[in-house]
């Protein structure tokens, strides 16, 4: 293209968000104009673009930028975008580091978003950390109360989700039907969570009843509807409905090698006729450690992140293996 013609067209295209360089080429990618930086859409051999980004966050060459309403990139300091705060240096959004804002410790995540408090590392693995408000990083090798709840953190800063070796009972149990989580507490006030269990409660047509009840140990192989059998049955006394139990995923026979894989994979979602299903290892633990414990069955507030479903998150499902006809947590196999 003739440079003089391009400069003439530039006045028209500039108003539409395009820019021609002095060479006559359409601006693409990160471009500096009159001391300010902009990012233009990148063109390819198959498609010509080139419009400037405005009022948005832009990912360019593995870095984040924030474009103003006129397209120029914000240079430095704190910027609010879409309700969140970001910190910039030389136009680049800073990521994966600790930063104080107004004297308060926080963390800039992988996308640069400033957050305080909990940082989710993995929903799939139920891994979270907590930004220590009194330090310069995550809480490590310590316990601390957050909103009245006592948490423990390991040397890597991860929330510890099983403290039953430290707290050996008596326990208090709470089941959240909405989030599919059973949380075991070391105190009656339920401020010291010590174990999280992934559960399936009743389907909408056969709901697990809400209320306050008591757990009592029942049978090693619990007869259920069908007929079928669940391992390590613990009765929810007073819940009615012909008998509500905590038990493992039911099998067609009273042995460990006829597990219905489809039902096992539903753990964490409503699936039962009213009972509270768990994996075998957790059913066994409740059977052995919660005889006589109070249990409260509630509808909690829905949480989108599994790691935040309950104070200790939602325990990850142990994947099936081998012939997939047995519970992988079953100590008998």
Language model region names:
Residues 1, 7, 11-170, 226:
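Extracellular adhesion/carbohydrate-binding repeat motifs centered on closely spaced tryptophans
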Residues 7, 67, 131, 189-202, ...:
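Short amphipathic beta-strand/extended segments with alternating polar/hydrophobic composition
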Residues 19, 107, 152, 172-174, ...:
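Soluble periplasmic/extracytoplasmic beta-strand elements of cell-envelope proteins
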Residues 24, 44, 71, 92, ...:
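A mature extracytoplasmic/lumenal domain signature
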Residues 122, 185-187, 237, 298:
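A generic structural motif
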Residues 125, 140, 175-181, 229-230, ...:
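A short, compositionally biased
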Residues 155-219, 231-232, 314, 318-323, ...:
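Cell wall/extracellular polymer interaction/catalysis modules
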Residues 207-210, 219-333:
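Exported/periplasmic cell-wall-interacting domains
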